[in-house]
Design a protein with these regions (language model features):
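N-terminal lobe of the biotin/lipoate ligase/transferase fold
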Residues: 1-106, 177, 195
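Long, positively charged amphipathic alpha-helical accessory segments at protein N-termini or as interdomain linkers
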Residues: 17, 85-111, 121-221
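Short loop/edge segments at beta-strand edges and connector loops
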Residues: 26, 113-115
Length: 221
């Protein structure tokens, strides 16, 4: 059974903004809801909250997300991007693409993105993103980027209904994945790409969404 260690994650991330504060809960209803409950106007962006198990994880359109205990990465990031609430799809695209590229770079698995928020391996869903934004008085807008990744589930861990459509990284690799190491790599990439991409939105120079917007499914290279 894999357990995430908050302090070890924090040390490994060094000066990263995303991951400047890390919380690991054994169980919560939804990591997005847990972050929203913690956030105040003074909460700095970069807080990351993991849960070893979600009892009411959800995806787009409030679809239920199965979150097997200790078998995946279920987490949410508190952000304060300088974008309008109506542009939250940009955050969804950023998170999905960064998850996909990290899977490719770290595990050498072929990955596709199925809009608006699914990351797929072998044409099956391995990860999903749910971004929610809120206006706050006297503070930049609050964005919560929820990410769920199936890491070490076996086929039996998925319900019969999901088995034809879901996969884990371990199933695709035929071996378990070190969740702590993968989490560090992903958070580093999320931190770097968040700063790079959102800094370029004001000038209209972002290259991330051009391709994502124009294709319903595309392969990550």
């Amino acid at each position: 059974m894999s357990h995430l260690e908050a302090e070890a994650l924090r040390r490994a991330l060094g000066e990263c903004t995303i991951g400047r504060e890390i919380v690991v809960l054994e169980e919560t209803t939804s990591t997005n809801d847990a972050v929203l409950q913690m956030a105040t106007a003074n909460t700095r962006e970069g807080l990351v909250l993991f849960a070893e198990h979600q009892t009411a994880g959800r995806g787009q359109r409030n679809n239920r997300w199965e979150s097997a205990a200790h078998k995946g990465l279920w987490f949410s990031i508190l952000l304060r991007p300088m974008i309008d609430i109506s542009k939250s799809a940009r955050l969804t695209a950023w998170a999905a693409e960064t998850v996909a590229k990290t899977i490719l770079q770290e595990l050498a698995l072929a990955v596709t993105i199925k809009l608006p928020n699914d990351v797929c391996v072998e044409e099956k869903k391995v990860a999903g993103v749910l971004v929610e934004m809120r206006a706050q008085e006297n503070a930049p807008h609050l964005a919560i980027a929820g990410i769920g990744i199936n890491v070490n589930q076996t086929v039996e861990d998925f319900s019969e209904e999901l088995r034809p459509h879901a996969i884990s990284l371990a199933i695709a690799l035929d071996q378990p994945v070190d969740q702590q190491e993968f989490a560090v790599a992903l958070l580093r990439n999320l931190d770097r790409t968040y700063r790079e991409i959102f800094a370029s939105y004001e000038s209209g120079s972002s290259s991330l969404l051009l391709d994502v917007k124009t294709r319903r499914r595309r392969r990550i290279n």
